[in-house]
């Protein structure tokens, strides 16, 4: 696919989220994900619609409201409400699965991984994105606080930012590999995909994105005027972070 995924996202969601989702989408497009595929934690279905090949056999999420939104999209053959640890699917049904920025939000992650393993065929591909162990240490505010000797305040800020991000896990590849091994998965490869500069843009986007939150509450749309002309400056600012090389 050669379409401009960043531009598509900027027309639908706040810029800081558009940056993250567009970067993530590029990786899934390079991975072979045979049918039938499961989207674990599909949310409102926007990511599956914009980033994945259609049709997607099934999506599942634990929030009824977003399941209803996902059902309105044409990308999924079926969307179900359910918990990750009790997936309503037969053993060894899916040939692949994705879970984009979802696993970090599940407090008790091990049962969810075990049940996902149950519904996947032998040798099935499971691709997912999660924040790494560097997520908190890369934040600009906590970096400044530590630089001036306010380490305790930096830790409080990191706790606050993790809270508003609803994260339960910001872990290293080694920690994830241990979890996946126990659940029956073999890790083929992993990589870091968001640079410190991009993460700091994401960080400040949380605060600068408040007007979009108000727009969503009033109009039910994140972006009220999604024209190229209206988003020209936003695109120019965000694209410099989108095009950054992968961190080492």
Where are these regions (language model features)?
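Conserved functional loop/turn residues at catalytic and ligand-binding sites
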Residues: 88, 93, 105, 184
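A generic structural signal for alpha->beta connector loops
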Residues: 54-56, 76, 123, 184-187
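Active-site micro-motifs of SAM-dependent methyltransferase domains
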Residues: 86, 104, 133
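Active-site acidic short loop of glycosyltransferases
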Residues: 34, 91-92, 108, 122
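Residue-level "edge-of-site" marker
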Residues: 83, 102, 193-194
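S-adenosyl-L-methionine-dependent methyltransferase catalytic module, highlighting the catalytic core
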Residues: 107-115, 125-248
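A short SAM/SAH-binding and catalytic strip from SAM-dependent methyltransferases
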Residues: 98-107
């Amino acid at each position: 696919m050669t379409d401009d995924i960043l531009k598509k996202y900027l027309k639908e969601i706040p810029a800081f989220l558009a940056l993250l989702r567009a970067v993530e989408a590029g990786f899934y497009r390079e991975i072979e994900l045979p049918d039938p595929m499961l989207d674990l934690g599909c949310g409102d279905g926007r990511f599956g619609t914009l980033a994945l090949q259609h049709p997607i056999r099934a999506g599942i999420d634990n929030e009824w409201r977003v399941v209803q939104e996902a059902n309105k999209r044409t990308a999924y053959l079926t969307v179900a409400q359910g918990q990750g640890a009790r997936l309503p699917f037969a053993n060894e049904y899916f040939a692949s699965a994705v879970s984009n920025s979802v696993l970090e939000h599940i407090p008790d992650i091990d049962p969810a991984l075990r049940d996902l393993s149950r519904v996947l065929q032998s040798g099935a591909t499971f691709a997912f994105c999660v924040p790494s162990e560097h997520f908190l240490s890369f934040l600009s505010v906590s970096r400044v606080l530590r630089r001036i000797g306010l380490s305790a305040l930096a830790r409080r800020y990191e706790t606050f930012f993790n809270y508003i991000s609803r994260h339960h896990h910001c872990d290293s590849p080694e920690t994830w590999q241990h979890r996946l091994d126990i659940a029956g998965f073999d890790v083929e490869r992993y990589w870091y995909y968001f640079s410190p500069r991009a993460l700091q843009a994401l960080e400040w986007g949380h605060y600068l994105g408040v007007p979009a939150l108000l727009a969503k509450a009033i109009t039910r749309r994140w972006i009220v005027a999604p024209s190229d002309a209206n988003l020209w400056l936003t695109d120019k600012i965000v694209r410099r972070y989108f095009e950054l090389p992968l961190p080492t």
